Design a protein with these regions (language model features):
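Generic secondary-structure signature for well-ordered alpha-helical cores
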Residues: 22, 26, 42, 49, ...
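Conserved small/polar residues in nucleotide/adenosyl-binding loops
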Residues: 208-214
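N- or domain-start disorder-to-order transition segments that initiate the globular core
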Residues: 2-50
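Signature of multi-pass transmembrane helix bundles
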Residues: 2-13, 185-200, 210
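FAD-binding core of FAD-dependent oxidoreductases
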Residues: 56-70, 74-78, 85-110, 138-160, ...
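Generic structural signal for well-ordered, non-membrane alpha-helical segments
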Residues: 10-14, 30-37, 41, 71, ...
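FAD-binding glycine-rich core of flavoenzymes that anchor FAD
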Residues: 114-140
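An acidic intrinsically disordered interaction segment
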Residues: 119, 166-175
């Protein structure tokens, strides 16, 4: 379909980004991208099951808690808490065009199949993009080289049913919008919080929309 762009079907160039935004194209996950994502997820699940050593940020805590082992029944909670604890950006609300671009760039990055996420996680990002469900992201809080942790945490908090979003011009609770669409909050699996928060999609979008010529 001409009004749909398949994420993960090839390189995401400036020209393609402009076409997606200017022509208001919808996104869908390319079949080959689904295969890559699932293959990587299967590998990670197998690695966790078979490994006899701790895996940082996956079966251990973060930072100074790196020596704390996380039990298998707490792996999901660890990732959800990571997103919640880092959703602390402040300042002015970012324009919706920036928020939507962040979704686009992250969906593309995850479609490459190197991050260990679930297919449903990427699909929900695409769902938010296609239906103009815009999380509230603020303009202060990025760590720069370490990644846009706080802005990305604010971006993805609504995927797990927490925080507020703009939908149909109104600010409302994310969980109410999920209910309206019949979407279950994404149950993050091991490593997914890390995959969502590590990235430079916020900075990249600011650069892309800057007045400087490309």
């Amino acid at each position: 379909m001409k009004n749909v762009y398949q994420i993960g079907s090839g390189d995401l160039t400036f020209d393609i980004i402009e076409r997606i935004i200017n022509e208001n194209l919808k996104l869908e996950l390319a079949p080959e991208a689904k295969d890559r994502i699932q293959k990587c997820r299967n590998y990670l699940d197998r690695k966790i099951k078979e490994s006899d050593v701790p895996l940082y940020g996956i079966t251990t805590g973060f930072g100074s808690l790196c020596n704390r082992n996380i039990s298998s029944d707490e792996l999901s909670t660890l990732q959800e808490n990571l997103v919640k604890s880092h959703a602390c950006s402040v300042g002015a609300e970012m324009p919706h065009v920036i928020v939507k671009l962040m979704f686009l760039l992250k969906a593309h990055a995850l479609s490459l199949g190197h991050s260990g996420v679930q297919v449903i996680t990427v699909q929900r990002i695409i769902d938010f993009f296609n239906n103009d469900v815009m999380p509230i992201v603020y303009d202060r809080g990025s760590l720069g080289a370490s990644g846009d942790l706080a802005p990305l945490a604010n971006l993805f908090l609504p995927l797990i049913g927490v925080g507020d979003v703009y939908y149909k011009g109104k600010r409302c609770e994310a969980i109410s919008v999920l209910d309206e669409f019949g979407w279950e909050p994404v149950k993050l699996k091991s490593k997914e919080g890390l995959a969502l928060l590590n990235g430079t999609q916020f900075m990249s979008c600011l650069l892309y929309t800057s007045p400087s010529p490309r």
